[in-house]
Amino acid sequence: MLLTTTPVIEGKRITHYYGIVAGEAVLGANVLKDLFAGIRDFVGGRSGTYEKELQHAREIALEELQENAHRLGANAVIGIDIDYEVLGKENGMLMVSVSGTAVFVE
């Protein structure tokens, strides 16, 4: 399945719009505590552990988006937006959400 942040796919013609599709993934409080506890793996101001967890959450959200688009009969998702949001100041959960428009292209 083609995934893109752009509103069109160059060289392809959109023949059907299925509508908005989304996917979400939430990192729980324990994961974030573990990540922040592992801050000592900082290299050049970046935490490899934290980045890996964020990447994994983004991959889960994108897989869910693809599954939802596939169920509709789409073969591409255009205009994808990826957002990161902290849920609750006390429990520190992090949500990765992705959304886009499911389409069929030829």
UniProtKB/Swiss-Prot annotation:
Q: Which Pfam families match?
A: YbjQ_1
Q: Which cysteines are joined by disulfide bonds?
A: none
Taxonomic superkingdom = Bacteria
Tell me which Gene3D superfamilies the record gives. Answer: Hypothetical protein apc22750. Chain B (3.30.110.70)
Entry's HAMAP family? Answer: UPF0145 (MF_00338)
Q: Which family does the similarity line name?
A: Belongs to the UPF0145 family.
Q: What is this protein called?
A: UPF0145 protein NE1032
